A protein has these predicted regions:
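Right-handed parallel beta-helix
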Residues: 47-50, 112, 117-128, 131-158, 160-162, 169-226, 230-233, ...
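Short beta-alpha connecting loops at secondary-structure transitions
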Residues: 107, 325, 353, 547-548, ...
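Short, solvent-exposed loop/turn segments at secondary-structure boundaries
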Residues: 35-38, 138, 166, 474-479, ...
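Extracellular "leader-to-stem" segments immediately downstream of a signal peptide or signal-anchor
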Residues: 1-134, 150-152, 197-226, 367-369, ...
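Parallel beta-helix/beta-solenoid repeats that form elongated, surface-exposed shafts/blades used
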Residues: 789, 797, 848, 858, ...
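Residues that act as N-cap/strand-start positions at coil-to-secondary-structure junctions
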Residues: 64, 107, 135-137, 157, ...
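Short, T/G/N/S-enriched strand-turn elements that build extracellular solenoid repeat scaffolds
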Residues: 46-50, 65-74, 111, 115, ...
Length: 886
């Protein structure tokens, strides 16, 4: 029987930018003029999609009046025709007109659009027509989310609160821009990895809309700006573990970013987060970044320009949490969480950076590298306690640094001061190391343009019209649908391009399929999703190639082809390489899930338990674009090389919870992942011995941006290319390695030049591993800038070859770095937070063995426990550091 979604897919011939919609809202009775309430008919359509297994409700250009909330379940999406509300109605966007909630201070209960895990909202604008710029009043949040939600290319015309998610898991907020009046984003209790990308908050969005009631005169616009400058906090963040934010712009706000703790939904805990942000620009704010409570190991900020009136960055004093203690909630506070800043311009404020964090025993560190401080009123930096590191910074003004009398250490390397460095003389107890000629601390620029996803033009070919048979998770089809997919793809290729659409459902795939040039193979998902966030949507159950990894990949992309919108699952995959285990439990080798080609596009895929997920090395794949891919592989997540030049892997996120956490998958691993008698423990043991997250061979100008892998043996594997003999040349931002054995591994014969900006890592498996590890015969260079590692089992480096640079490196209770004969390590502008297991400086920070070389400069241990053992016989340079112990 033909599923409901496809039976209604006459609307699949919508414009390509609409996606391949299951239902068209206007055809179902929605009013695009905004005169009548459309909420009821839109909700009915969403419910139909949900019953059919998932899909997209498309909103053509127009205004849609909502008189009650919309609920979007997992596996479903709302997608409009465009979100830009500027110069309405000339550009014909899709606008949701929220006609309820005026004066309602409850942000959650009646939020306009409510997204469940695995749901998405994209390409719409949201407008509250009864809001008044002269005297704004509260409204519920424009968007509420719960769990793995995606909000993409959404414009806020005049929201009180734009997006609220207090259980935001691996949320994605991208292309989220507009006017917010009280809060732009409020997100907490997120784990591995919440992402906020390409967001902007500015009163100009409302003013530029031209919508009724918008401010139109300069005085009216200025009134709105003044409101924002006294009321708006653009981003409020509670616990966001491994949060990665990129390209944040704020103009006119009381505060740009507020890092704090908030209660969870049950009122049982209040935890902070460890967040890394990059490319942050702020104008006309009172305080740029307010750090009320920062989770360990700290907050990383890379690249930006912050202009403020009171303070560009403020690390506030320890909050008074007594009212929470009185009701049994114990907010967590990290006493030694660091703040590290690279490549940021600060200007205009009374004090540019201020730390009021003051209590006996504090060992935190503030660390600046390649920053510019100018136009301050009182001083550039004021810090009461802890340690201060500043390298390669430029200070334009008098009395740049105001040291508190209890400041422990100040390390200044390679800075330029136009006036006196200190506003007051450091106290006698403060250790000061200063060398303005020391230029050994490295800073490397990084940027990526905002990439645009390609939409494939042409006819839509429905695989059901070619005989595909969809089933359900609990009713897997017997019939192989790969011939139907192949026939639809061949027809699209013959037509010169188009989209081959597979509606929601489970499809048995027993043979590999090829996607012709100019064609995209599409499932029902419109945004990033995870295997454990929903069992709905289009799922490919793979029975092809078991035991034959050299056979045809599941999906082979030809040049200029694309694939997206699927969950891919291997029902016969196992968890262990133990030969004595039952056959069903033993790991199976398969051909790659995806094989790429030049200029291909891969998006919105969850690849749950592949052998190799993405093969970008068999065919040179210049200019490939891979975005929003999640899941996990057992051999390698991504392999790229063969001379590939140019390309981007964005938000590629390998986390086995997509398999482990999805109870609908019959063979999902179960139990404690530390207990090897359970299938989950067997699986974790296998992946942390065998699996490589990203294998980088001969590729140049290929960037990895905000990518993550958990529980693998090697996060980044730098290898000699088997086709060309060459090695990787490129940079990354936002690499995260969680519970890995090792982070970056340089293998014998490889000669890469690899740069990791703003990486985070925990290396706790297989008795603990290293952030960087190199083999004998490795002849390349590895550089890390403003990165952090933590966890008691994690160690710093184990180097047997090549050159490694750790610049502005934050090691939080991690020690025991080893540099062997033939290897070189430079540690510069680094921060070490001795804590767990090293309360008296017992552990060695780094040992340079005989035959090794390197340098340590401009670095500090917050507890004065910098313990570097030099066995090189004069080949280790020691320059301008904090206190060193023997």
């Amino acid at each position: 029987m033909r599923p409901l979604v496809s039976a209604l897919c006459a609307f699949a011939l919508l414009p390509a930018f609409a996606g391949v919609a299951g239902l068209d809202a206007v055809s179902r009775g929605a009013d695009p003029t905004g005169q009548r309430d459309s909420a009821a008919v839109m909700q009915k359509a969403l419910d139909e999609l949900n019953r059919a297994g998932g899909g997209t409700l498309y909103l053509p250009p127009g205004k849609y009046r909502l008189e009650k909330p919309l609920y979007v379940e997992g596996g479903n999406s709302i997608r409009g025709a465009g979100s830009s509300a500027a110069n309405w109605p000339a550009n014909r966007p899709t606008i949701l007109c929220v006609a309820f909630g005026r004066g309602d201070t409850n942000l959650v209960k009646n939020a306009a659009v409510k997204l469940r895990g695995g749901a998405s909202l994209r390409d719409v604008a949201i407008w509250h027509p009864d809001q008044r710029f002269e005297d704004p009043v509260p409204y519920p949040a424009s968007i509420w989310g719960d769990g793995h939600t995606s909000v993409v290319d959404v414009t806020l015309v005049n929201s009180w609160c734009g997006f609220y998610n207090n259980h935001c898991s691996s949320m994605l907020v991208r292309g989220f821009r507009g006017t917010a009046l009280n809060m732009g984003i409020r997100a907490a209790y997120a784990f591995d990895v919440p992402r906020i990308e390409h967001v902007a908050f500015d009163p100009a969005y409302w003013a530029a809309s031209g919508l009724p009631g918008s401010p139109k005169t300069p005085s009216a616009v200025r009134k709105l700006e003044m409101w924002a400058e006294n009321n708006l906090i653009a981003i409020v963040a509670g616990e966001q573990d491994w949060g990665y934010w990129w390209d944040v712009f704020v103009d006119h706000a009381k505060g740009g970013i507020f890092l704090t703790v908030v209660p969870d939904d049950k009122g049982e805990r209040m935890n902070p987060g460890n967040i890394a942000a990059g490319k942050v620009v702020m104008r006309n704010v009172q305080v740029g970044i307010e750090m009320k409570n920062v989770g360990y190991p700290g907050f990383l900020l890379t690249y930006g320009d912050i202009q403020a009136r009171l303070c560009c960055m403020h690390y506030s004093k320890v909050p008074d949490y007594s009212k929470f203690h009185a009701v049994g909630i114990k907010p967590y506070y990290s006493w030694n969480a660091a703040v590290q800043v690279t490549g940021v311009k600060f200007s205009g404020a009374k004090t540019l950076f201020r730390s009021d964090k003051d209590k006996d025993g504090l060992i935190y560190c503030i660390n600046f590298n390649d920053c510019t401080f100018s136009d301050w009123k009182d001083c550039a930096i004021s810090q009461l306690r802890g340690s201060l590191v500043a390298s390669n910074c430029r200070f334009s003004g008098k009395g740049a640094i105001h040291p508190g009398e209890n400041l422990s250490q100040i390390v200044l390397s390679g800075n330029m001061f136009s006036g006196e460095a200190f506003a007051v003389k450091p106290s006698a107890s403060t250790v000061v190391a200063r060398d303005d000629r020391e230029k050994g601390v490295v800073s490397l620029p990084y940027d990526i343009p905002e990439p645009k996803e390609r939409e494939f033009k042409g006819k839509v070919f429905d695989v059901l019209d070619y005989g595909a048979t969809p089933g359900k998770v609990d009713d897997i089809p017997v019939k192989d649908s790969s011939p139907a997919f192949a026939a639809a793809l061949a027809a699209a290729g013959k037509a010169g391009g188009g989209t081959v659409f597979a509606p929601a459902g489970v499809y048995r795939i027993a043979r590999g399929i090829k996607v012709p040039s100019g064609v995209e193979l599409r499932g029902s998902f419109e945004a990033q999703h995870y295997g454990n966030s929903t069992h709905r949507g289009t799922q490919l159950y793979v029975y092809a190639g078991k035991g034959d990894p050299a056979s045809a990949p599941l999906i082979t992309l030809e040049p200029d082809a694309g694939v997206g919108g699927f969950t891919v699952y291997y029902p016969e995959q196992g968890v262990t390489d133990d030969s004595s285990a039952d056959e069903a439990l033993r790991v199976k080798r398969y051909p790659p899930t995806l094989r790429t080609a030049p200029r291909c596009q891969v998006r919105n895929m969850a690849i749950v338990n592949a052998w190799t997920a993405i093969d970008a090395i068999t065919v040179r794949s210049d200019g490939l674009f891979v975005t929003d891919v999640t899941g996990g592989a057992l051999d390698a997540g991504v392999i790229v090389g063969h001379g590939t030049t140019g390309g981007l892997f964005r938000d590629v996120h390998f986390n086995y919870t997509g398999w482990v956490g999805q109870g609908k998958y019959e063979n999902h691993p179960r139990g404690d992942d530390w207990d090897k008698t359970t299938t989950c423990g067997m699986f974790a043991d296998f992946t942390t011995r065998v699996t490589r997250g990203f294998v980088l061979c001969d590729a140049k100008e290929v960037k990895l941006h905000s990518c993550f892998c958990i529980m693998v043996a090697e996060g980044i594997s730098l290898e000699k290319d088997p086709y060309t003999g060459g090695s990787f040349r490129g940079s990354t931002w936002g690499l995260a390695f969680d519970a890995n054995t090792n982070g970056i591994v340089g293998h014998r014969g490889a000669e890469p030049k690899f740069v990791a900006n703003c990486a985070m890592g925990v290396f706790s498996r297989q008795q603990g591993g290293y952030f960087v590890k190199t083999e004998p015969g490795f002849a390349g260079a590895i550089a890390s800038v403003n990165s952090e590692i933590w966890s008691g089992r994690s160690r710093i480096v184990y180097l047997e070859g090549g050159r490694t640079i750790l610049s502005q490196f934050l090691s939080w209770c991690c020690y025991e770095g080893v540099v062997k004969k033939g290897a070189s390590l430079t540690v510069c502008g680094a921060t070490f937070a001795s804590n767990n297991g090293n309360d008296k400086g017992e552990k060695t920070t780094i040992t340079y063995e005989r035959g090794s070389s390197g340098a340590v400069c401009g670095s500090v241990d917050g507890r004065r426990f910098l313990k570097v053992v030099d066995e090189t016989g004069g080949k280790l340079a020691w320059r301008n550091n904090g206190v060193r112990i023997d």
